[in-house]
């Protein structure tokens, strides 16, 4: 009767239910209940509404497309301001590396992983060419080697400032390295705020871009789907549960207890700045970016994203040819 996808299944479960009329259209419920409608994020409507119909709602926003940085390390390394271009980003990495070596420390500037790689690639793609920009903005990532090669080259440059052992790092490993002061930057979203030690002077920055035009991501991924069972009583009950999840009471708990950004526009972050200043500042940094794009899960198909993440580290360390990587991406 009610499915929670957790952000997965856009190209499988969701597509099947949409095509086979197995998902209930939620728009009639929103049209009849203004209070319910006011609890739904505009991002949900703009991305998921199709032909006037809406088959999913989510209780959280995904805010990312940037990185956490250790302000204390930045200061010690002589970085006076957050990088606004990729050249400045690489210069910051060089400064951190030089400072670390001079001080006899083992601090690495930044670590690319299979998990954060697509966020980085999407930001780089936006400034590669008009074709690549259109692909990102139109959520259709059919890219040629011409668009992908410059992105891979920049990612190789950034990778040189990470751990060269090519361990299969995950976001928790990155978080642990950041908390121990062994890495200066931590590519992740707002939701990672809860993972960062309070003793770290951690700030958030969107990705840099061409001519200083910064880039971040704000999305609503696939969430709850109400089954179109034909049983009006159970369908209505499922919708009541969605109303509950989007209520201010629950949305506030999501914010304060999980560190995720609630999707309801009724939650005003300025009211919580004293309680969760780090997260609030991170959200402000993302919303202050010059350009906002979707998160990778809303840009790439599930197969494309899996292929990208499974092979990106091989391409960056030189064990997989770039041309072959581009071919494999769409298989």
Where are these regions (language model features)?
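Paired acidic/hydrophobic, glycine-rich loop segments that form the ligand-binding mouth/hinge
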Residues: 1-4, 184-189
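Hinge/lid segment of periplasmic solute-binding proteins
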Residues: 8-64, 205, 274-276, 287
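Short, solvent-exposed loop/beta-turn-alpha elements that line the ligand-binding surface or hinge
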Residues: 25-40, 81, 100-101, 109-110, ...
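Extracytoplasmic/periplasmic solute-binding protein
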Residues: 49-60, 65, 90-140
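Extracytoplasmic/periplasmic substrate-recognition and gating elements
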Residues: 76-77, 160-161, 197-261, 310
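Short helix-initiation/N-cap motifs at beta->coil->alpha
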Residues: 86-90, 166-179
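Glycine-centered hinge/linker elements that transmit conformational signals in sensory
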Residues: 92-94, 138-168
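Long, aromatic- and glycine/proline-rich binding clefts that accommodate carbohydrate-like moieties
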Residues: 205, 255-309, 313-314
């Amino acid at each position: 009767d009610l499915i929670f996808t957790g952000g997965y299944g856009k190209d499988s479960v969701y597509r099947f239910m949409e095509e086979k009329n197995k998902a209930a259209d939620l728009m009639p419920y929103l049209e009849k209940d203004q209070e319910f409608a006011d609890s739904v994020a505009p991002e949900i409507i703009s991305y998921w509404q199709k032909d006037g119909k809406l088959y999913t709602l989510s209780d959280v926003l995904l805010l990312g497309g940037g990185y956490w940085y250790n302000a204390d390390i930045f200061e010690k390394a002589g970085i006076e301001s957050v990088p606004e271009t990729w050249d400045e980003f690489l210069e910051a990495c060089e400064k951190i590396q030089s400072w670390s070596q001079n001080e006899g420390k083992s601090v690495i500037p930044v670590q690319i992983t299979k998990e954060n790689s697509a966020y980085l690639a999407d930001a780089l793609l936006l400034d590669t060419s008009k074709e690549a920009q259109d692909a990102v903005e139109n959520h259709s990532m059919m890219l040629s080697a011409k668009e992908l090669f410059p992105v891979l080259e920049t990612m190789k440059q950034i990778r040189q400032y990470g751990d060269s052992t090519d361990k299969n790092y995950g976001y928790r490993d990155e978080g642990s390295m950041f908390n121990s002061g062994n890495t200066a930057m931590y590519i992740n979203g707002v939701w990672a705020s809860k993972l960062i030690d309070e003793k770290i002077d951690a700030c958030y920055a969107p990705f840099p871009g061409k001519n200083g035009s910064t880039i971040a991501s704000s999305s609503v991924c696939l969430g709850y789907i109400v089954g179109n069972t034909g049983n009006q009583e159970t369908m209505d009950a499922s919708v009541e549960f969605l109303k509950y999840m989007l209520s201010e009471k629950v949305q506030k708990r999501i914010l304060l207890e999980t560190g995720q950004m609630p999707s309801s526009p009724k939650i005003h972050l300025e009211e919580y700045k004293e309680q969760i200043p780090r997260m609030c500042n991170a959200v402000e940094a993302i919303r202050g970016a010059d350009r906002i794009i979707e998160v990778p899960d809303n840009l790439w198909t599930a197969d494309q994203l899996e292929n990208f993440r499974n092979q990106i580290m091989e391409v960056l360390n030189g064990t997989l040819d770039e041309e072959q990587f581009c071919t494999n991406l769409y298989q």
